[in-house]
Structures are given as structure tokens and as C-alpha cells.
């Protein structure tokens, strides 16, 4: 049943919606009529798929349908960043941090390091990652700011189980291979033209790639062929739906961090990544004020379910001492967008930073 309130559609997904969402998170086929293709898999016609998707987008359950690119494979440098602020300064600091076009995720979390964001800079950045972070730290008056780049990627696979059939402690049946990060070849000018189109939100119409192809000055098969090549080269992980976790019913977002001895990292990292509730698993650097080396992101429908999944990981790995782990929950979302590549915003931000001008703020 759907109702409207305050101009926003409220929609409770039914079983068919949930099956569709699972399929779309796994990936949309790179074919001329992708909605008809996914409908055929689910016993729906194209019109029904488009209607359901329209409602799910109006209800903000589906954020967008687009290519999911690998930042590093495209030549960008990126990192998770942790920052510490007094509570009274946090929101203004978050607006300044969010004004950088390479900040796609920006959250308040339950820790002394209370602002967590992801930062990416272009391949030809004049500042680079470290100096960009330092400019943000100075502009926001951070008490501390730590760069936490990926040292080892064990897993990245954000696919929420919309059907509810998956137990909180479920594990992969076979070890998932470590993700590849591109082929080391920089995108060409033609590649960038295709990427600029594929990173948009896919229109809800029978042949959506045709419209994009016309905008790029190519035919639809050329665009789709380029997209398939990007997948083969690991530029693109998949073309898929990105959900609003909370609106999809996953209200708990716990970042579980673990103190793991150096000689156990390569054993325990993959074992943590095997849990289906874990969407991301990374090894990151430690600091005197940050001793945790492995990060696991857990999404669940409730905090209790999140804690159950984390307890199962602790039991599996033997890290049962509470002093060797922490769970940081997201309590406020300042910014969450799909990162846009090869756009002028990065250079414009650096122009301001290098000139010593005031930095832009997210939300104006």
C-alpha cells in the first residue's frame, strides 16, 4: 500500500519489490532493454518493472541506477578519513568537508573521532590527498584528523538482503576472490566521455541506454560495448541499483573495527569478509590514538541484529576481548552521493584552496 505525506511517496515494498531490489543490486544487464531482461528473470513484464521502480524511486528507497566504478582503477586517489571535533563545531565542520566534490560519504559516528568521511582526488590533483586533507583540517579547526587509506581490500559488495531470508551470521559458501582494482591503464579521452554518461541515473524507459548514447554522440551498442569493456578491465564493478539503506529497512549501520596482530591479518581479514552481513572489509593503517587495523561495515535491520552479526565475527576470529574491537554507529548522515568522475568541480575546489579563499560548503 502507498500513501503520500508531505509531498513524498511512502511505500512498503511487497515480496515482488524485494525480489526486484535484490536482482537490481546484483546488477542490471548491459543490454538495449535492461528492464525487460530483469523482468523476464522474475516473471514480470517490462511495464510492471518500470512501474515498481518508479514507486521505489519516488519513495527514495532506490537512490539511483548507475555504473558503480572503482575509484582507484580510474586513477583517483582516495581514503577514509577520521576527524575529531567538539560537538558544537561538528555540523559546521561537516558542511565544509562536504563541500569538496570528492567527498561522497560524510557521517557522524559514535566515537571520540566523531566525523568520518571518504575523500577522493583526481589523477592530476595539484594538492594530492594528504594536502587536501590538511586544508580541510585547517579550515574546519579539527582537533585531530587521520588519513586511513586502504592497505588491503578484502571485500566490497553492498547488496542488502531485501527478502529477509539471510541469517545474521550467514557466510559465503566459498571464499570470495579478492577484488581486482583495474588493469593499470589510465582511461582515454573516449573512455572518460563514456564514463561521464554511465555514471548518471538511468532513465526509467524501455531503451534507456539509447538516450545516453545520443548524448554521447555514439550509438547504443557502442556505449554498451564500452560498458562491458569497463567491467572486463575492472573500471566498473557492475551497473546496479544503489539503495537508501534506512528507507530500505536497514536502520543500523555499524562500522566494526578490530585490533588484529600483524601476523594474523591475512588469516582473519578474509574470514571476516566471508560474513554476508559484511559489505566492506579493509585493512587500514593504525596510529597511536587509533589502534584498529581491520574495518568491517555491517548493515542490519536493527542494532540488535548488527550486534549479533558482529558477535558472530568475534566468535569466528577469536577476538572476543571487548578491548580489541569497537563498533561505531552512524547517527547522522551529512552527505551521501555517488562520486562523480572527471568533472570540473575538483579543479574549482583546488583553485579556491590554493588561493586561500573560503572553501565551499555542502548545501550552500
Predicted regions and their residues:
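A compositional/biophysical signature of low hydrophobicity enriched in polar/charged and small residues
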Residues: 1-364
